[in-house]
């Protein structure tokens, strides 16, 4: 099939590679404009642009995909299908309805659940047993198009946002290729989404990672995993940010008198871990990163920093 691919971040790269490896004709790649980064403000390519350039594929970078001039330029590529994976802009009906097979989107959730941005992280934060990937035929709504194919993935006990991202990226790449095969063969019957079952997730911001120790240890442990590696869960100690990268949940700590502790209080300090009281249960902290320092296991942190029981975190 003659394909135009629209995508921007790392998550989309695997799908572009899979389309190329499957022998489809990628006529053009559409991605977000280059962004200035660092002190030098030098322009940096998106991961998808890097991949396209490596394969000698034409790259288009519209500021606004809705601009009529871009729509008309896109039309000249005569695509059979447009594949959209985390492109980063809403598409007008003039693009959605342009190709013979429409615009096919790869979404990292089991639609209609977890429509919107950041479905991967939220699946971990919410403690979902399963996540997955859905391919759908796009319409003008937010992840509301007809479902084409679905693949479920069971989350591991210590799944992080990063590990699930990698797994679903691989699943999505192969599922999209299967979807293109099915569309071409006429063996796929689109299924309308049940809007009554839909849920939407919010876009994540750095501030969301601030830990509220009044919550249960189980909730906070999932937050830590879901926001690893970005934007990360954090608290404060002596006015410095302390990121917490890995922790376990403990329901009871034998040496702690429950009625004497407050949420956010350090209640035990061992050789390799320390424990924080929460609204319900305790967090046993295994890996941290103090502001201005590298990530390290808690043992290394404790050897370089004097931490005592009774210290209140979050201040």
PLM feature segments, named:
Residues 213-315:
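An anion-binding loop in the catalytic cleft
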Residues 1-40:
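N-terminal Rossmann-like dinucleotide-binding module
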Residues 22, 32, 81-200, 207:
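Donor/substrate-binding cores of folate-linked one-carbon enzymes
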């Amino acid at each position: 099939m003659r394909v135009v691919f629209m995508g921007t971040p790392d998550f989309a790269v695997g799908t572009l590679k899979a389309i190329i490896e499957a022998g489809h004709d990628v006529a053009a790649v559409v991605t977000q404009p280059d962004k200035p980064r660092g002190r030098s403000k030098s322009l940096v390519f998106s991961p998808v642009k890097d991949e396209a350039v490596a394969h000698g594929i034409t790259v288009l970078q519209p500021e606004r995909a809705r601009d009529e001039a871009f729509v008309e330029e896109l039309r000249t590529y005569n695509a059979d299908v447009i594949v959209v994976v985390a492109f980063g802009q809403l598409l007008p009906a003039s693009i959605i309805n342009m190709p013979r097979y429409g615009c096919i989107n790869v979404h990292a959730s089991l639609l209609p659940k977890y429509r919107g941005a950041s479905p991967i992280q939220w699946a971990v934060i919410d403690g979902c047993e399963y996540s997955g990937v859905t391919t759908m035929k796009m319409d003008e709504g937010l992840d509301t198009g007809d479902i084409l194919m679905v693949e479920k993935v069971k989350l591991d006990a210590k799944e992080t946002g990063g590990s699930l991202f990698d797994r679903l990226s691989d699943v999505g790449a192969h599922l999209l290729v299967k979807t293109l095969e099915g569309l071409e063969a006429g063996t796929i019957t689109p299924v309308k989404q049940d809007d009554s079952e839909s849920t939407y997730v919010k876009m994540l911001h750095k501030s969301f990672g601030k830990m509220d120790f009044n919550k249960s240890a189980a909730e906070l442990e999932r937050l830590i995993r879901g926001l690893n590696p970005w934007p990360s869960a954090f608290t404060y100690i002596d006015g410095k940010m302390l990121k917490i990268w890995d922790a376990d949940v403990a329901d009871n700590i034998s040496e702690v008198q429950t009625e004497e502790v407050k949420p956010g209080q350090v209640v035990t300090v061992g050789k390799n871990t320390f424990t924080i009281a929460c609204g319900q249960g305790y967090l046993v902290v295994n890996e941290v990163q103090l502001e201005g320092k590298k990530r390290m296991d808690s043992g290394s942190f404790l050897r370089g920093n004097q931490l005592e029981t009774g210290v209140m975190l979050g201040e």
